């Protein structure tokens, strides 16, 4: 059987998925964004030298990521508004890159993949915004879902 897009009607029109008949269950998701910021910024971040006019980079990006997750349904048109029970954003430097890992949790009728992905994306965009005065050569790479649990199926990358 051919798979179908869940947010498109048979007539090709966008539609929100009706979740009214679903039971509320525990839903979790984890996502990651990787950034290549170059050696100059990386060494400044590693040495805690960067506290810019806009504030401390990683701490600001963590807050921005959580805020982004909470506002996902306002950014992605057909995404259901959900009550997040938890959202975490961790930022580390690994193998010469910035690695942003996020998690989102709810008990609800729909998953939290988009919230975890939005948290990772917004945190990465915030790092870019705060460091662009040093270099515009920053690259946000590999924004990806690592895992989702709950609902019809589970997924692990």
Give residue spans per PLM region:
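C-terminal binding/interaction regions
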Residues: 1-80, 84-157
């Amino acid at each position: 059987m051919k798979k179908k897009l869940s947010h498109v009607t048979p007539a090709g029109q966008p539609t929100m998925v009706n979740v009214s008949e679903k039971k509320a269950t525990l839903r979790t998701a984890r996502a990651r964004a990787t950034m290549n910021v170059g050696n100059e910024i990386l060494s400044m971040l590693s040495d805690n030298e960067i506290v810019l006019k806009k504030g401390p980079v990683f701490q600001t990006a963590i807050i921005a990521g959580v805020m982004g997750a909470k506002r996902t349904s306002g950014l992605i048109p057909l995404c259901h508004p959900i009550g997040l029970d938890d959202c975490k954003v961790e930022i580390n430097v690994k193998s010469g890159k910035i690695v942003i890992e996020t998690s989102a949790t709810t008990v609800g009728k729909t998953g939290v993949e988009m919230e975890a992905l939005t948290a990772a994306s917004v945190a990465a965009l915030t790092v870019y915004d705060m460091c662009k005065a040093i270099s515009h050569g920053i690259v946000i790479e590999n924004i990806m879902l690592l895992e989702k649990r709950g609902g019809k199926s589970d997924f692990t990358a």
